[in-house]
Amino acid sequence: DIDTLLLDKTGTITIGNRKATHFHTAPGIDLHAFVENCLLSSLSDETPEGKSIVELGRESGIRMRSLNTTGARMIKFTAETKCSGVDLPDGTQIRKGAFDAIRKIVETAGNKFPEEVEKVIAAISSNGGTPLVVCVNRKVTGVIELQDIIKPGIQERFERLRKMGVKTVMVTGDNPLTAKYIAEKAGVDDFIAEAKPEDKMEYIKKEQQSGKLVAMMG
């Protein structure tokens, strides 16, 4: 019988369809201009997240016709850079991505990462959301909040496994605050945050060394 079950968060514990729910601006940044920049960087983004950013922007009253992407160069998301965006013909560079990735871009350029924005990021994360940080010309302009939905009935399933003596472990690329919130909501016993494939292997090895039989799902 298995002792430990590792589960991928996305699609197994959550529905896996993260949606943009809020635009949060950095101090002194105009909301309308911020939303336009978010949309410009998402227009050719085919991911569910990208499409939901465009959708939320439309609902915020942004006229799509006023967005000009002629001659723009789209920057695709990669696992290495952890961000995506657009380079506009006038030299404007817009990037959106993970907190650590954008912080690196901003601080490498000698700019400060606003404390107020860090607070917003912490609040989104501890509420189970995913913060996508946006910067324009290497200066932070705000955060897009994404939310994922935990599958109904998942807590009961984990409760049953617990009674059978199975330890459940959620594996996610989310930051530790978001991971902790979702792990608690879903009712798993443990979690691996900001997980890379080698972290998963490391955890499995550790469990096996203590004589546990480990299975993986998702």
Predicted segments with their positions:
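Cytosolic catalytic headpiece
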Residues: 1-13, 18-218
